[in-house]
From Swiss-Prot:
Seems to act as a signaling molecule involved in the maintenance of iron homeostasis. Seems to be required in conjunction with HFE to regulate both intestinal iron absorption and iron storage in macrophages. Has very strong antibacterial activity against the marine Gram-negative bacteria V.alginolyticus (MIC=24 uM), V.fluvialis, V.harveyis (MIC=12 uM) and V.parahaemolyticus (MIC=6 uM). Has antibacterial activity against the Gram-negative bacteria A.hydrophila (MIC=6 uM), E.coli (MIC=24 uM), and E.coli BL21(DE3)plysS (MIC=6 uM), and the Gram-positive bacteria B.cereus (MIC=24 uM), B.subtilis (MIC=6 uM), C.glutamicum (MIC=3 uM), M.luteus (MIC=3 uM), M.lysodeikticus, S.aureus (MIC=6 uM) and S.epidermis (MIC=12 uM). Expressed in all tissues tested, with highest levels of expression in kidney and lowest levels in liver. Intra-peritoneal injection of lipopolysaccharide results in increased expression in heart, spleen and stomach, but not in kidney or liver. Residues 1-24 form the signal peptide. It is found in: Secreted. This is Hepcidin.
Amino acid sequence: MKTFSVAVAVAVVLAFICLQESSAVPANEEQELEQQIYFADPEMPVESCKMPYYMRENRQGSPARCRFCCRCCPRMRGCGICCRF
């Protein structure tokens, strides 16, 4: 019975991995999808997506430049606030 439980668990894990891989989007298609999403609304100007830098202090007290951007900082996987210290 224990062997059967292990076999079922392995089958479930393998099925989950296969589903995850099949639902992944290749990198070049992902960029095209993002461009379609960003430029799909003609009424929204591109400038409204770009937020200017604003000042923020880091732990040492020196000012840091932060802005909202997409994939502009290392290890960033989407859009968010990026601060370069």
